Amino acid sequence: MAQKKGGGSTRNGRDSESKRLGVKVYGGQAINAGGIIIRQRGTRTHAGVNVGMGKDHTLFALVDGHVKFATRGEGKKQFVDVVPAA
């Protein structure tokens, strides 16, 4: 005979893998062309000058320079620019 009761089953124990979203390079920091600035879902932050946007809304630098965040336009949207290195 079994000396212990059989272990019950559970319906828990699953979770999705984290997507590592967020700001990767902050304002004032240097960045190389092609470097990722922000990984995001949707356009929480918009691409500004010298910044490109990937199909998953990732913002990346088009030129070497420094990152600069700014709010502008209708509704004070947040933009990120890359100021080219002198």
UniProtKB/Swiss-Prot annotation:
A GO-annotated cellular component: cytosolic large ribosomal subunit
Domain of life according to the entry: Bacteria
Ribonucleoprotein listed as a keyword: yes
Gly residues bias spans: 1-10
Keyword terms, alphabetized: Ribonucleoprotein, Ribosomal protein
GO function terms (MF aspect): structural constituent of ribosome
Location of region: Disordered: 1-21
Gene Ontology terms describing biological process: translation
Keyword field contains Ribonucleoprotein: yes
Gene3D superfamilies referenced in this protein's UniProt entry, alphabetically: 2.40.50.100
One Pfam family of this chain: Ribosomal_L27
HAMAP family named among the record's database cross-references: Ribosomal_bL27
Family: Belongs to the bacterial ribosomal protein bL27 family.
PANTHER family from the UniProt entry: LARGE RIBOSOMAL SUBUNIT PROTEIN BL27M (PTHR15893:SF0), RIBOSOMAL PROTEIN L27 (PTHR15893)
NCBIfam families hit by this protein: L27
Designated name of the protein: Large ribosomal subunit protein bL27
Organism of this sequence: Ralstonia nicotianae (strain ATCC BAA-1114 / GMI1000)
